Amino acid sequence: MQFMTNGFLRGLTMAGALFLGLGRASLSTAETPGAGPAADARGTIDQPLQQKIEALAAVHKGRVTLYATQLNTGKTVSLDADRPVQTASVIKLAILFEAMEQVRAGKARWDEKLTLAKGDGVSGSGVLTFFDTPLTLTLKDVLTMMVIVSDNTATNLGIDRFGVSAVNARIAWLGLKDTHLYKKIGKPATEPMPADQPKFGLGKTTAHEMETVMERIGRCQLAGPGESAEPGDEAICRTALTMLRNQFYRNTIPRYLEKLDSSETGSGIASKTGSLNAVRNDVAIIAGKSGPMIVSIFTDENEDKSWTADNEAEMMIARLAKEIVETWSPAGLDGKALVPGLGLDAGSSSGASK
């Protein structure tokens, strides 16, 4: 996983080069096939596409949960989108969002200094654990490492800076009921753990709730209820999007959608992955020529636990993303549109109700 050593080895390899049937992909009652396009609180179900993704997910040897929406049209598709799942490293999006809000409030600065001390390093994905200590880094450097190479040591530095309780308070502020950060990675818990922590590990979420977090980042919606956008919001969101569009792990959602790698500019995809042995996840903002999309896909109980490039769950995520994006944006991607706000009005389509 990006969260454990074998995933890290996979990441280094990449760096060197730069349900068991339909019943397991169960549908919510709002997603009954054959009923024609239907409206729910989140948008309008794209019924033909819904049937295609159901068929794709039905052959996967594991479980798939998914929520995707095209923001300018309100079209949606989903599979079991409200079932709580293991986040693995996708929970790092919530840490990033809390950092953005604290920078906005003047309680943190991108250029503030954090110190990596002896004993801070943890195993798993990332490279900071191999650096000599003490080492001084900026907050921006730490969060960049947390996002683009899913650095676990950097993640813990971020958690130390903001606190587990602050991240969870922010999650509650967003109105999310089934998303939670439990603890630092590879370190003992410093507070009593909820009863469900052993089941979920580092964090839990749903495909729909993590779509909400990524959509807030893409739309640059940092203001709370009754608050107005501030002049500095765009710069904060641009910094976060730069991290996310330079994502190093690109074998899942980006796999069939573009040929750019993380060393090249202009990617139309900003994403965060998360992996454990039997878990593979990816959540992305995708700047399509026909309009921006958020695609949130989680897989668990996967039979294929390998760390090879053709891992079945990673291939499944890639195929689902390809089907969604090529249906909603047949002309392809537009990297120039991956900017704060995504070219949308502040209250347009699905985001206004979240």
Enumerate the predicted regions with their spans.
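Active-site SXXK
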Residues: 74, 86-114, 295
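Conserved catalytic neighborhood of penicillin-recognizing serine enzymes
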Residues: 119-156, 164, 203
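Mid-domain, small-residue-enriched loop/turn segments at the edges of structured enzyme/sensor domains
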Residues: 63, 135, 156-222, 227, ...
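A short, well-structured edge-of-sheet supersecondary motif
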Residues: 48-81, 293-297
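Bacterial N-terminal signal peptides that target proteins for export
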Residues: 2-13
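Structured C-terminal helix/loop/strand segments within mature extracytoplasmic catalytic/sensor domains
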Residues: 32-56, 161-163, 213-257, 261-268, ...
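Acidic helix-start/capping segments at beta-turn-to-alpha-helix junctions
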Residues: 71-72, 110-127, 162-163, 184-189, ...
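Bacterial N-terminal signal peptides
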Residues: 11-24
